[in-house]
Amino acid sequence: MSRRNRNNYLSIAAVRTIGLDFIEMLEETNRRSISDRNTLTDIYNTEFRDRDGGVKDPNFSRVLYALRNANKARLSRTGRVYFNTNVRTGLHDQWFRPRRRQQNQANATPGNVSSVTPSSDQGPSCPESGVRARRKLVKYILQRLNTTDRSHFIADKWGVRVSSELYIEDGKIRISVDEAEVYELKLFVENTGQEAVYFTYYTALCWLQYFTLEDSRKVTRNNPLRLEPREKYEVIVRFKSSHVGVYSATLAFEFKKNTQPTTRSFHIVRFIEAEYRSKLAALLGPTEPYKPLRLNISEPENCIIDEGFPPDGYLQNFLVNVLPLGKYIPPPDTTILAELLKEDCSSRIFRGKLKDLQSLLQSPLTFDNYAERFDLLLYLEECQMHVDIKRYNKDSVTLHRDRDKRLMGLNLPGVSENRPSVLRGDHLLLTKSEEVTFSNVTKYKGYVHRVELDQVKLGLSKRFLKDVYIDKMKFRVEFTVNRIPVRLQHRAVHMAVQHNLKDVLFPMASRSLNPVSPPALRLFDRKLEYNFQQYSAVCNIVAGTSKPAPYLVFGPPGTGKTVTIVEAIKQVEKNIPDAYILACAPSNSAADQLCEKLITSEHVDAHKIYRLYASSRNQKDIPKILKDNCNVDEEMIDFPCKEDLMSYKILICTLVTAGRLVTGGFSEDHFTHNFVDEAGHAVESETIISVAGLLNAEKGQLVLAGDPKQLGPILRSPLAINHGLDVSLLERLMTQNDLYKRGDVEFDNRYVSKLIMNYRSHPYILEVPNRLFYDGELKACADEISSNQYCMWEHLPSKGFPVIFHGVPGKDERESNSPSFFNIYEINILVDYLKKLLLTQPKKGISRIFPKDIGIIAPYRKQVEKIKRAIDADKDFQDYMGIDNLKVGSVEEFQGQERKVIMVSTVRSSVKYISLDETFNIGFLKNEKRFNVAVTRAKSLLIMVGNPMILRTDESWGRFIDFCLERGGYTGISITSVERIDDVESRLLALNIQDEETEESPVQRYVDPEFRNDY
């Protein structure tokens, strides 16, 4: 192919790449400021265009067109050329002048290094430099990585040593700076052998604008340096950044033993990690090196339980038990199956019962295997719960006598945050510290009578108090799992089969041969009449158009699904005289919200509404407005008799507490309508507690409201999760049942209503999740005064765009025996924004904000703890009124909530842990639901902090960051001037990265979620 034809075939992308190389050459020869087009053309033609000594590149006009097309250059009216200031700049790559090179080649002798040409099996040893040489070297090292381990590249070899004035550990040099000044690091290339070697080339394998390289002899392949024995040569690395964070560079040094063409080059790689730390970062750093904790899950051979005494006098139970609740103890086969599956054993190992269980686990859910499959999944989950809770076991703990001489006090930091959950009526096990390793031990059962902040009051046996306990005696404390919820789920799935709920759980179609049109209702909340989707949902629920199939209210964030459910409940009560309604939710807070909205609306007689709490509910957590409509009276919890409970038209409780109604003998014909709000938060078997035995499949109507695009229930067993336990009934129906799938245009309103009016967020905050998860159908309908409140905030990178992505090159760290990750550099940025929000006087048009209006979200428990510590330690916040009302928590803790301002710390800043996130479904990366929840909590201002190079490996995050770039909302570390992190670095650093060997679930290790107590 001729030179002319070759250039014609080049794509615009290829031409643009040539242009970027030219800009880099200008930068590296200190001529970037030149803007005269004629001068640039001369430089291009004389020094760059034929730099390979072969085929010329396209003419300068074509290159300039490609750069302008990509917004990398612009041409003024006067004919001057201005290159984008953010075009990649960075590590100097020792360019050369091709004309001089060609002259040298013309005069080369066989012994001259310039005559070296690569053989087909050699490393990149051709006499070229600059970007192309670097890329060639990168490709070469990548190919070698397929067959060679990391140690090969970091090892000194053939007598050549690459050292530093600083300590080098495993090929890495760490430098730390505490101010924005130039830091200079000296690297020494030394020949410790007996023969001379040639230092032919050195470069960075990835580009970062914060480093520069320099050496006095300007070593390139065209200007190699001969190193005599014992000779040492200096290479200077300079670092400077104005942004706190961690910056990495991977440097490759190339050498040859001689200048013969057939001589193979060899390489030595060094990693440089520069940390620019603030005082806050120093305060929050690791307390001690991370050492994985191996849990002790062994049990003594013989164990005697010394029974304590449970709390009494706080419960009046008039609801007689009619249907007993089975024990449902996990069989031994379940534990064996879990171990074999965890070890990824060959299927040939499975025999008999284990083979049947494996087959059941791998089979799809049907009504025929419904109970058995859920039994197995629940057993797997429970086994993991028993393991995970052992992380909280404490050794060498002392007790103290309470003022109530029947009780003992025990300090338990973390119990106030449900880590672990400890409720009244639960029990703990105490073992004398000196007897922990004995094969025969006595464990003393202590029942929880009261929970007071981080202290519990235990009721132990009289024998313990009188004969065993001595002041300052030390014990191991073991926590236990409350099995009631999981037992209720087992019973529910079996009752679902016994009561033949197939048409509810696996619906085919409505039985009505002549389906009635939904009535034209006059709604109590008149605003809903102007929202077609909400109005349609209420009318179809009242008409029962889906029966016996459940009716689904698909409610994306901020679309008013709870308001819709409340209106539907009120309309059913009004229009169907013989209706009796059971309204449930997975959590007490969601159930309380339902009850509050019903009572305060005054459209239903409050005497018809009753809120039923579990016996473990703390009276302090019950809203005052519900005191007259619930079963809690001062310090007493009262379970009314069945007849009294059946007299209420609307009964509200959690899904788990609904199981108490089944135990109490409620008829399946009593409730005509069962509503489940936040149905996406519950596992299917938990939802079924409120259905099986309480709803007639022929006559009753089940209504589920939620969003399958948001986070589901928190589970611990990877096996249970991987085999579907994390899929809610709502999500299963919407994704696997044809009745609920979208048609050519929309959903079938007889079975499902998708709410599309968002009343929460500013349109720009809603933009990306709307496009990613909701087909672009959501319409921003929030109050403009509220949603636009921060559009003119002085700290916005782009006025009118209340979304910020702040790029931070941070560092994933762990400490002590906690495997949870934290990133102190992101915390530094978050605290800075918090001060700008709370401590600076708001300008005209921006009202003052209070801590309760701000939420900070992080995916890992340790990051949450560090953020809280940073706020507590900051003197500016110590006396700030209401600072305790600022919520910092995980994504799961914020689901269903909203704040005026949301700040998010993404934490992940290392490629080597991305596979960990994806495999175990933790963190933000590779988890669309967690991303969706995080970005949809904010009403007026959303601030994201993270590492853009890492996050852009994920599609959702990539779309979000690109959106911020397009709209001018990006700030922090420059992203357009940084080449995407090369595979070299990630593969060199991430070879054989594996999770620690432990019995704990990944969720427990990294996220450390609350143990549920909200039943």
Curated annotation (Swiss-Prot):
Superkingdom of origin: Eukaryota
GO cellular component assignments: cytosol; P granule; P-body
Enzyme class: hydrolase
Sites where the protein binds ATP: 555-562
Entry function: Probable RNA helicase. Required for RNA-mediated gene silencing by the RNA-induced silencing complex (RISC). Required for both miRNA-mediated translational repression and miRNA-mediated cleavage of complementary mRNAs by RISC.
Family, per entry: Belongs to the DNA2/NAM7 helicase family. SDE3 subfamily.
The protein's name: Putative helicase mov-10-B.2
Species this chain originates from: Danio rerio
